[in-house]
């Protein structure tokens, strides 16, 4: 074996809180307590007021850091009805009850995400 292979073999992955999916943080507001339904509604209203296009993504908690998230349908281009956006979040929850769910506001003027936030974390 080469010296590099010996060093790699000796590296150990020690368990830590980073191995616990419940301890991981994702996107804006992730270090705050879980938002209430009314607080999520206000964030959606903000996204709509900025003219951003909402989109929903979901992913298994254990894959959320190192993998791409799944897009729920297509981004909701031009959608301004907050209740329709909430209904899509709820539909995603029903179809993927064990997944994390993220709401994104795409800013098509700046060609970037205006915001992204976790709106659902499954009970573990």
UniProtKB/Swiss-Prot annotation:
GO MF: ribulose-bisphosphate carboxylase activity
Alphabetical list of SMART domains matching this protein: RuBisCO_small
InterPro entries per record: RuBisCO_ssu, RuBisCO_ssu_dom, RuBisCO_ssu_sf
Spans through the membrane: none
Keyword Transmembrane helix: no
Record bears the keyword Cell inner membrane: no
GO biological process: reductive pentose-phosphate cycle
Assigned keywords, A-Z: Calvin cycle, Carbon dioxide fixation
Self-association and partners: Heterohexadecamer of 8 large and 8 small subunits.
Family according to the record: Belongs to the RuBisCO small chain family.
Further comment found in the protein's record: The basic functional RuBisCO is composed of a large chain homodimer in a 'head-to-tail' conformation. In form I RuBisCO this homodimer is arranged in a barrel-like tetramer with the small subunits forming a tetrameric 'cap' on each end of the 'barrel'.
Function summary: RuBisCO catalyzes two reactions: the carboxylation of D-ribulose 1,5-bisphosphate, the primary event in carbon dioxide fixation, as well as the oxidative fragmentation of the pentose substrate. Both reactions occur simultaneously and in competition at the same active site. Although the small subunit is not catalytic it is essential for maximal activity.
Name listed for the protein in its UniProt record: Ribulose bisphosphate carboxylase small subunit
